[in-house]
């Protein structure tokens, strides 16, 4: 949820050469770093007595909420002013992190929700995007392509395909009115957007209807107009009118207040290409040949009875995934229709493939015992003489019957086999890098399968819902920790 790369926390970022090692408590130095890396916090708390300004920040549970706060300036761009978030139904920084009482923060009376949007600044007007209209889809694609997500050094920029936008924004139950845009009145040019899709999630067993907020994007020339809070308020109003009072979103910046925080990991599939475009460094003392050899993958998968997922597998995968995700504190509560939409590739000559899903079918019982999936998100390589894009595969959902055996060693072995096959299949599909978070049971295989730590952190947020902090799969040193699993079981695009 942001007009900058930091809102995603997953821009095409370089792996991190050096480990960050923030302490388990928010020290005065770390609190000052938090202010430094979030300009709006610094600006709006700057008028207060320094000790008072830092006191609220020190009350945060750093090990749960801010593990791995980037101290390298990666959090420089703010999604919206800190003052704005003080007016919203979100947990405050100074609330006790151990408060386990879960539930809505504010009860919404739909009769009191405005039927009309707030007025925009002169020269701009609201619009509702029709993504079934090829021209309006192209406008959104154009805005996102040139103004959405870019790395700090302007070397890489996300390149969402139109097929990806259809997949991401037209899931079951999608509403046209939740695809919000802002146009320049005179030119009619689309200059800002925010989108949401409806779904249900479970938070510590409580099933709630939410809107997944995404693609908050503002034209670079309008970043000073403070449109982000206005866009957030407008999508909130439209959701309220449809009876949805909670939302889930992610950001790479620290806002009030993360429910969890995961770290990105990257596994090179074409190391030489990643090195040539500046994504992967050449480690000191190593050589190109050594790095290519280190990241080499077998030509063939090793899991018996592995095959691409088909429409006939939807019910079995739905059952397996639902049982698996129930092990996590926060996760999506999928419907059968959502499984079909999100996981089944429907070949079409007009559309690029976005999702790759595979199942393991027992040849005797024909039961689906395992499945995994990954999706495609390319990045443009800006002004490079040889390469124009990096193809990144993002680990999506997976599940395995082995997870129910109460045998972590067996689960670790099974996931390492499955995920190594995912890497092989992604390599065969011409992907250059495979990305994954420390969510789910990912700490069981990330380091063993030669994923490298990234400098991207993804913070998870709930709007108008309070719950105690949820483990993000990392420890106080921001490293994958098998003892910190079982928290995040949701994947946000």
Curated annotation (Swiss-Prot):
Catalytic activity line of the entry: N-terminal glycyl-[protein] + tetradecanoyl-CoA = N-tetradecanoylglycyl-[protein] + CoA + H(+)
Lineage: Eukaryota, Fungi, Dikarya, Ascomycota, Pezizomycotina
Gene Ontology MF annotations: glycylpeptide N-tetradecanoyltransferase activity
Protein name: Glycylpeptide N-tetradecanoyltransferase
Gene name of the record: swoF
A GO biological-process term: establishment of cell polarity
GO cellular component, as recorded: cytosol
Organism of this sequence: Emericella nidulans (strain FGSC A4 / ATCC 38163 / CBS 112.46 / NRRL 194 / M139) (Aspergillus nidulans)
Region: Disordered, residue numbers: 1-30
Ligand binding (tetradecanoyl-CoA): 82-85, 216-218, 224-228
InterPro entries: Acyl_CoA_acyltransferase (IPR016181), NMT (IPR000903), NMT_C (IPR022677), NMT_CS (IPR022678), NMT_N (IPR022676)
One Pfam short name: NMT_C
Subcellular localization: Cytoplasm
Family to which this protein belongs: Belongs to the NMT family.
Subunit structure and binding partners: Monomer.
Biological role: Adds a myristoyl group to the N-terminal glycine residue of certain cellular proteins.
Effect of substituting residue 370 to Y: Causes a temperature sensitive growth defect
Superkingdom classification of source: Eukaryota
EC number per UniProt: 2.3.1.97
């Amino acid at each position: 949820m942001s007009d900058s790369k930091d809102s995603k926390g997953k821009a095409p970022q370089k792996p991190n050469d050096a480990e960050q090692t923030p302490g388990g408590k928010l020290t005065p130095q770390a609190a000052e770093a938090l202010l430094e890396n979030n300009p709006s916090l610094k600006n709006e708390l700057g008028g207060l007595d320094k000790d008072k300004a830092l006191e609220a920040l020190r009350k945060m549970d750093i090990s749960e909420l801010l593990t791995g706060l980037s101290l390298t300036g990666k959090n420089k761009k703010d999604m919206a002013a800190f003052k704005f978030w003080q007016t919203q139904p979100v947990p405050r920084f100074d609330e006790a992190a151990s408060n386990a009482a879960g539930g809505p923060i504010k009860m919404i009376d739909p009769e009191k929700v405005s039927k009309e949007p707030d007025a925009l600044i002169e020269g701009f007007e609201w619009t509702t995007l029709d993504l079934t209209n090829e021209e309006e889809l192209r406008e959104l694609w154009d805005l996102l392509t040139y103004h959405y997500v870019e790395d700090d050094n302007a070397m890489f920029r996300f390149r969402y395909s139109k097929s990806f936008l259809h997949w991401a924004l037209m899931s079951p139950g999608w509403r046209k009115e939740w695809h919000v845009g802002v146009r320049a009145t005179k030119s009619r040019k689309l200059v800002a957007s925010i989108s949401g899709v409806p779904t249900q999630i479970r938070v510590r067993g409580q099933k709630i209807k939410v809107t997944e907020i995404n693609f908050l994007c503002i034209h670079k020339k309008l970043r000073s107009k403070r449109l982000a809070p206005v866009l957030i308020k407008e999508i909130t109003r439209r959701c309220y009118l449809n009876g949805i009072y909670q939302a889930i979103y992610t950001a790479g910046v620290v806002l009030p207040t993360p429910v969890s925080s995961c770290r990105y990991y990257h596994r090179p599939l074409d190391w030489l290409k990643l090195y040539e475009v500046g994504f992967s460094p050449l480690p000191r003392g190593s050589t190109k040949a050594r790095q290519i050899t280190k990241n080499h993958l077998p030509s063939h998968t090793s899991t018996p009875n592995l095959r691409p997922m088909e429409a006939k597998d939807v019910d079995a995968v739905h059952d397996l995934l639902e049982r698996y995700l129930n092990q996590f504190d926060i996760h999506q509560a999928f419907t059968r229709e959502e499984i079909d939409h999100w996981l089944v590739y429907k070949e079409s000559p007009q559309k690029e493939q976005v999702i790759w899903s595979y199942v393991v079918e027992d040849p005797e019982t024909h039961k689906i015992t395992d499945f995994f999936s990954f999706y495609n998100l390319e990045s443009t390589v800006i002004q490079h003489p040889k390469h124009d894009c990096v193809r990144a595969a993002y680990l999506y959902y997976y599940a395995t019957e082995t997870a129910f055996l109460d045998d972590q060693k067996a689960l670790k072995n099974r996931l390492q086999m499955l995920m190594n096959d995912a890497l092989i299949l992604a390599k065969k599909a011409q992907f250059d890098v495979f990305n994954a978070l420390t969510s789910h049971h990912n700490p069981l295989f990330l380091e063993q399968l030669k994923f490298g730590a990234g400098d991207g952190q993804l913070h998870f947020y709930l709007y108008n819902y309070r719950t105690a902090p949820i483990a993000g799969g990392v420890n106080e040193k921001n490293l994958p920790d098998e003892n910190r699993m079982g928290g995040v079981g949701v994947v946000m695009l």
